[in-house]
């Protein structure tokens, strides 16, 4: 995503902040993930957002590097056996496979710490920038989203028929997906409606609607489940995208209105990025996947809506948004 000039500036900054030292296993592990081939979307967003206000890339590159450190830390920890247990990352062995688990944990910790060391050294607006980043990656952001993701993995999010079945009792009843009144008002319809509602309540109390008891979820619940997946996407990914945009805006001296527009653009972009990822990864992993809940057509409609919102947010800015516009199009097309 970064143009070659900015990418080279980022590599120079990484080498300056984290010089190569083949005898230091921890530093080698940190550099291993940082210098692997990657899109660098988050650091790009810092630079591109600051460009809207005519800030030079070389003036924001240390902040962009700090954001990259945070992202790298999250990848290392996500790949650990206690998390996603992934053997590869960025077309190479994941950090704990290349080195070992203990080194991977420490490398992630060190990258996160280094990010805040860099940001605390800024001459201007450092507290504001640190606050925005902290909110995006803490319990209300990336880390909280990872916790939601892990705790949701035991749930089967695939679409189910309008039947609730409890394996341990053998009871099976078909529930109506909606209740419709067939009589005009004041003609006894209230009694029929009450009977229908009573039937549903009796059925729900009889059946044990918990996945641990072998339940199949009613199709009418899919909307709520999809919303939960979107919440995970928002917290794990979109909030750091948005923070990267807002931090670039802060560096550029944006107004509150401009900051909000860029933050919202980042949310739109991050949600598109994750939805596209769900489409591409559907055959490999159906867990916590929007495709499993909504189907491809509805997910694509969701992406189209987010794309339009992203364009609307960019239209509220008067500066050079070409880089951000191109990125929005590219992510919508390719993920």
Question: What is the predicted role of each segment?
Answer:
Residues 1-18:
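N-terminal amphipathic/basic leader segments beginning at the initiator methionine
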Residues 2, 122-123, 174, 178:
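Intrinsically disordered, low-complexity regions enriched in Ser/Pro/Gly/Gln/His and often acidic
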Residues 15-160, 169, 196-276, 282-332:
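Mg2+-dependent prenyl diphosphate-binding active-site environment of isoprenoid biosynthetic enzymes
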Residues 165, 172-173, 182, 192-194, ...:
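Charged/polar low-complexity intrinsically disordered segments
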Residues 176, 180-181, 190-191, 198, ...:
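Short, linear, compositionally biased motifs with a strong N-terminal bias
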């Amino acid at each position: 995503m970064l143009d070659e000039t900015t990418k080279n500036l980022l590599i120079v900054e990484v080498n300056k902040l984290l010089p190569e030292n083949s005898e230091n296993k921890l530093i080698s592990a940190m550099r291993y993930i940082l210098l692997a081939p990657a899109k660098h979307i988050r650091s790009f967003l810092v630079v591109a957002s600051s460009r809207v206000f005519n800030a030079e890339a070389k003036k924001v590159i240390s902040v962009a590097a700090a954001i990259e450190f945070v992202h790298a830390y999250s990848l290392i920890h996500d790949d650990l056996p206690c998390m996603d247990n992934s053997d590869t990352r960025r077309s190479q062995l994941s950090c704990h496979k290349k080195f070992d688990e203990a080194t991977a944990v420490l490398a992630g910790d060190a990258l996160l710490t280094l990010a805040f060391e860099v940001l605390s050294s800024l001459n201007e607006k450092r507290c504001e920038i640190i606050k925005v980043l902290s909110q995006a990656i803490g319990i209300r952001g990336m880390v909280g989203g990872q916790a939601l993701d892990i705790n949701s993995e035991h749930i089967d999010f695939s679409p189910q028929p309008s039947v609730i079945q409890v394996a341990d009792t053998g009871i099976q009843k078909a529930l109506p997906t909606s209740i419709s009144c067939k009589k005009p008002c004041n003609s006894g319809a209230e009694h029929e409606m009450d009977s229908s509602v009573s039937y549903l309540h009796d059925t729900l109390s009889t059946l044990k609607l918990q996945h641990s008891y072998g339940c199949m979820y009613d199709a009418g619940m899919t909307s709520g489940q999809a919303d939960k997946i979107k919440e995970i996407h928002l917290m794990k990914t979109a909030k750091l995208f948005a923070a990267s945009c807002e931090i670039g805006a802060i560096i550029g001296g944006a107004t509150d209105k401009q900051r909000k527009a860029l933050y919202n653009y980042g949310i739109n972009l991050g949600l598109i990025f994750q939805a596209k990822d769900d489409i591409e990864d559907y055959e490999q992993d159906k867990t916590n996947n929007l495709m499993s809940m909504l189907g491809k057509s509805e997910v694509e409609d969701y992406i189209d809506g987010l794309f339009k919102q992203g364009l609307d947010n960019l239209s509220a800015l008067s500066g050079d948004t070409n880089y951000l516009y191109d990125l929005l199009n590219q992510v919508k097309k390719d993920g």
